Design a protein with these regions (language model features):
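Short beta-strand to alpha-helix junction loop
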Residues: 121-142, 199, 282-286
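N-terminal Rossmann-like FAD-binding beta1-loop-alpha1 element of flavoenzymes
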Residues: 11-38
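FAD/FMN-dependent oxidoreductases across multiple families
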Residues: 257-259, 265, 276-396
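C-terminal helical "tail/cap" subdomain of flavin- and related membrane-associated enzymes
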Residues: 363-600
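Glycine-rich FAD pyrophosphate-binding loop
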Residues: 30-52
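N-terminal FAD cofactor-binding segment of flavoenzymes
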Residues: 46-108
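Conserved Rossmann-like nucleotide-cofactor binding loop
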Residues: 21, 44, 197
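Predominantly flavin-linked oxidoreductase catalytic cores and closely associated redox partners
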Residues: 143-293, 297-300
């Protein structure tokens, strides 16, 4: 890499923004053999900022370990055991039988890891961690500095642009903050990774408004000197077979009425803690720092968090953005927060940012190597990416509602999210294999890798995962939105009519992946839905050399069937309860009229 402040630069690709997504994109295009100009003006604050999105999820780990060359850095990060959701923990000093919980241990059993010869593939596929963003970005910058194809124009920000018509280059005008330096970058393709500045989405009018009244604000901070001893036996969970784990080793989410708290442990005794709130339930004129500390104070388990240990604090009153476009046939693309952000799923957002950037990379590669613009691929990416963000938003939308107090909704809404994550395992394996074996360099492809990339062209989207990859992505998003909404409305009806279901808990693992949902039908007992592990036949284990491993193909289909069965039960049970209530009301009305007639 060369660091440039010259007035005029030219490259195949210009990447705007040198955050984690911008740095990754610069590396992606350099590895595809193209010249890159990376444009940004970094400051001490921007390079040390503790950004959110620390918990790697779905595809993030895969892309960062391979194209990002962060295998060693991530291996040294805080290992993510899984994720753990809880509702009803306010005012309690420990998790107990009145708390609703949903957890998943993402770490694979040793026998599964040992079955794969290429351990780099195992780490790319299943080595999720919790990262300190400025430290990871510093490593990415050092990697970028070694790449001769990348020119880092590090003294200016994009101020204006002229989009080319036809086959010409775009022209991006940049200027330093002190207005002492400026110039122009000419490039065939323009990739906007400017984050919440949203340079292209704002300038070109690609922003989509939300019209459903759901808006969220957020406040978050990173804390130092959090002694690990505070995570004592109160954080322990014992599985049915006797295995003991600690919940704090997961990415922890604590739900309450109209808010969501995340607790993410990091290396060096640091912790990231954030609160997101439904603005309809909290006075939007209140200071979000005050809201943050008020909600944290509701949890005795978090009493170790002190203002004096706060390294950095951020707050934003509006943390939802949506773009109608990811990639344009006019040869520009919008990636990361520049395109869309759905609070509070920042980690999910990073995953979507990197996966859609990879799709755009394939489009750019075809164009710059002479194959021309693949407009059908562009159309599919735009439709599927927008649908993915809608689906992601539906995952969070109703968890802020009163329905979360209903234990069945708590379980079934997370079960629906779990379906998406389970179905993603197959393309996650496929893209991990492609990236690990090619290093992101298409010239290293074999016929098998070409086949993998052809499959991923359609299925590396949340709304195009097998087994629903043949359905239009917008239809999949609408079904997901309606499904979540229906679960919430039935739960709200139960709550409004005095029906209080017993608390429930499900802690799942790769080899104990299906909760005992049948126990929800027995109201006299606590819903302990956690299954015991199953030892599978050795021949079904993933070896790492397959294109579509049978075990991963089965995962999405199995969880789809489980979700459909749970939906049928929820609809039928609630319908029966409605009918019973209606019959009881009518009978009481008849009796009341009879009494009135008798005593008239």
């Amino acid at each position: 890499m060369t660091s440039q402040t010259a007035h005029d630069l030219r490259a195949d690709v210009c990447v705007l923004g040198a955050g984690i997504v911008g740095l990754w994109n610069a590396l992606q295009y350099a590895k595809r053999g193209f010249s890159v100009v990376l444009l940004d003006e970094l400051t001490e604050h921007s390079t040390t900022d503790y950004k959110v999105g620390e918990s790697l999820l779905v595809f993030s780990n895969t892309f960062l370990r391979t194209i990002g060359e962060l295998d060693d850095e991530l291996t040294d990060s805080f290992v993510k055991q899984g994720f753990w959701m809880a509702y009803g923990l306010e005012g309690k000093t420990s998790f107990d039988d009145t708390t609703c919980e949903w957890g998943f241990l993402a770490q694979l059993p040793d026998r599964w890891r040992d079955a794969v010869a290429d351990q780099k593939l195992v780490r790319a596929m299943a080595g999720d961690v919790q990262i300190v963003r400025p430290e990871v970005e510093a490593t990415l910058r050092r990697t970028v500095a070694k790449i001769p194809e990348i020119t880092f124009c590090d003294h200016g920000l994009a101020r204006d642009l002229v989009l080319a018509d036809g086959e010409g280059d775009h022209a991006v005008s940049w200027r330093s903050r002190d207005r002492q330096r400026g110039g122009t970058v000419s490039a065939r393709w323009l990739i906007d990774c400017t984050g919440r500045t949203r340079f292209l989405a704002t300038k070109l009018g690609h922003d989509l408004p939300f019209t459903d009244g759901f808006a969220t604000g957020a406040a978050w901070g990173q804390f130092a000197d959090c002694d690990p001893s505070v995570f004592d036996e109160r954080w322990e969970y014992t599985f049915p077979e006797g295995r003991v784990i600690r919940r704090d080793l997961d990415t922890v989410h604590l739900w309450g009425d109209g808010y969501w708290v995340w607790v993410i442990r990091l290396t060096g005794d640091r912790i990231s803690v954030g609160v997101t709130v439904d603005r309809a339930k909290f006075d939007e004129h209140r200071n979000l720092r005050d809201v943050f500390w008020e909600i944290v104070a509701r949890y005795p388990l978090l009493e170790f968090l002190k203002p004096e240990n706060l390294l950095q604090f951020h707050a934003s009153r509006d943390v939802q953005r949506l773009s109608e476009l990811t990639v344009s046939p006019r040869r520009y693309a919008i990636a990361g927060d520049s395109a869309s952000i759905i609070d509070a799923l920042y980690s999910q957002g990073l995953s979507l940012s990197l996966s859609t950037s990879w799709h755009v990379g394939n489009i750019v590669q075809a164009d710059l190597t002479g194959a021309g613009l693949d407009t059908s691929h562009i159309d599919h990416v735009n439709r599927a990416a927008l649908a993915d963000w809608r689906l992601t938003r539906s995952m969070a939308r109703w968890k802020y509602s009163d329905a979360m107090a209903d234990s069945r909704f708590f379980i079934l809404d997370h079960l629906l999210d779990y379906l998406v994550l389970s179905a993603a395992l197959l393309p996650r394996f496929q893209v991990s294999r492609w990236l690990t074996e090619t290093g992101g360099r298409p010239e290293a492809e074999t016929p098998t890798h070409v086949l993998l990339r052809a499959k991923l062209r359609r299925t590396l989207f949340l709304t195009q995962l097998p087994p629903w990859h043949r359905v239009d992505p917008a239809t999949v998003a609408r079904i997901a939105e309606d499904w979540h909404r229906g679960l919430a409305r039935r739960a709200e009806w139960r709550r409004a009519n005095g029906i209080r279901l017993k608390p429930a808990r499900a802690a799942l693992r790769a080899d104990a992946a299906v909760p005992h949902l049948w126990r929800l039908a027995f109201p006299r007992e606590r819903g302990e839905l956690t299954p015991k592990p199953i030892i599978e036949p050795g021949f079904v284990r993933v070896k790492g050399t397959e294109v579509s491993p049978a075990l991963l193909v089965a995962a999405g289909n199995l969880l789809l069937a489980v979700n459909l069965a749970a939906l049928v039960y929820d609809v039928a049970d609630t319908a029966v309860r409605r009918a019973e209530r209606a019959t009881t009301r009518r009978w009481r009305a008849v009796v009341a009229r009879g009494r009135a007639w008798v005593f008239a």
